[in-house]
Amino acid sequence: MLQRILVALLALGLSPLAMAAPSQVRITHEDGRYVLRVDGQPFRIKGAGMAGAGPAALAARGGNSFRTWDTGTDVADVRAMLDEAQRHGLKIAMGIAVGNERHGFDYDDDAAVAAQLSRIREEVNLYKDHPAVLMWVVGNELNLHYSNPKVWNAVGAITDMIHREDPNHPVMTTLAGFDKRLIDLLKARAPSLDLIGIQLYGDIGALPEKLSTSGWTGPYVVTEWGPTGHWESPLTSWKAPVEDDATRKAQLLQQRYEQVIAADTTQGLGSYVFLWGNKQERTPTWYGLFLPGGESTPAVDAMEYVWTGAWPSNRATSVAPLHLDGRVATESVTLQAGKPYAAKIAAQDADGDALEYRWTMLHETTATSIGGDREDVPPAVKIALHGDGKGGLRFDAPKRPGAYRLFVEVLDGQGHAAYANLPFRVEDR
C-alpha cells in the first residue's frame, strides 16, 4: 500500500517531503527584540543568495537558509529545490518576480498589475505548504531607478493576498538602500509587510544610522550584502572599477558580519550573503563566493567561521594584491603596445598545499547594467601568457590599444582557490 501511495504522489509531481506539514513561521516581539521562530524555535538566518553552488555545500559550511529571486517557470525544478533544501535542513526565502519599472513594467496599467497579482497567487499556492518554505520575498530592489509610487500599492496588495492564501509564512520586499521617504511610502502603501529586506554593500556600516534616521523600527533581514560594490569602488583614470582580491574580500565579509549583522539582535533577524555561486557582474569574480570552476574562495571560509565559530580544517590560499609592471590597480597601470611586461602575485597556503596559478586576460567590460541585470563575460584576449608556476608572469602587451584586465586564480588542489585581477590600459608606443 505504501509503495502505491508513493507512486501516486510522484505521478502528481509531489514528493513525500513536499507532503510534510508546512513550517509555521512567526516573527515575535520578546523583551524588546524581534525573534524569528520556525515551528516555535528561534531561527537566526545564516544564509546566502543561491546561484548554483548548491544547498549541500551551504549546509556543510554552517548555513541554514538561502534565498531565491523568483520561482522560475519549471514547477518540477522548484519542487526539487525545495526537497533538496529540506533534506539538508535548510529553509528558503522564496523570491517572487515582480515587475521593475526600469525593465518597463507600468504600474499605471491596471490590467498588467491585476495579471501579475493573479500569477503570483498561483505561484504561492503551488509551494506554500512545503516545509522548506521560510518566507516570501516580494520583488527585488523595486526602488532602484523608479518613479511611480504605485509599485508599493501593488506590493501591499500582493502581501495582503499572500497573507490570505498562506498564513504560515511572513512576507517582505527588498530595498536597494532606504531612507525616511521610502519607509514612509511603505508604511502608507504596503502596511501589512511583516518585515523588510535591506541590501547594502560597501556602505553596510551605515545601517544602524539608516535605521534610526529612516524611522524603520520593525524587523529586517539583510537580504544582500558582500564585497564592496563596483559602483562604490576606486576607479582608474579611465573609469575601470578596482576589485578587491579574494583575501581582502574575506576580511571585509568577516568584519561586516561581526560588526553590523551579528551585532543587531534587536531588529535584525539575520542575513543572506551575496552570492553562493558565481556570476558575471563587471567581472566574473566580483560577487561570487565560488569561482566558475566550482572552487570555494576565502570568503566561504570566512562565512563558515562567522556562522559556526570555527575555521574549516583546510582553508583557501591567501593572496596579496596583484602587481603589474611593479604597480597595483589603483595606480592606473598603462602599458605600451607590444612591449614586454611582468606581473606578480604573492600567495601563501597555511596548509602547505601545492599551488597552481592560472592566468587569463580579458577585454574590459563595456557593460553598464545595474541591479544585477545580466551581463556577458567579455571576450578573452588571444595572447601568450608565460607563468613561472610561482606567481610570476611575463607577456607582451596587446598590440591593440584599449582597456584590458589581467586575472589570476591560485588553486590549492583541495577544491579551494584565491584570486585577484587588475585593470590596465594599453596605449600606442
Question: Residue spans of the language-model regions?
Answer:
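Bacterial N-terminal signal peptides
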Residues: 7-16
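Active-site mouth of glycoside hydrolases
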Residues: 28-30, 37-193, 206, 216, ...
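Substrate-binding clefts and catalytic carboxylate motifs of secreted carbohydrate-active enzymes
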Residues: 30, 38, 45, 212-374, ...
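Aromatic- and acid-rich polysaccharide-binding/catalytic face
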Residues: 177-231, 235-236
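Short, surface-exposed loop/turn segments at beta-strand-coil junctions that are enriched for proline
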Residues: 396-401, 414
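C-terminal edge beta-strand
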Residues: 420-427
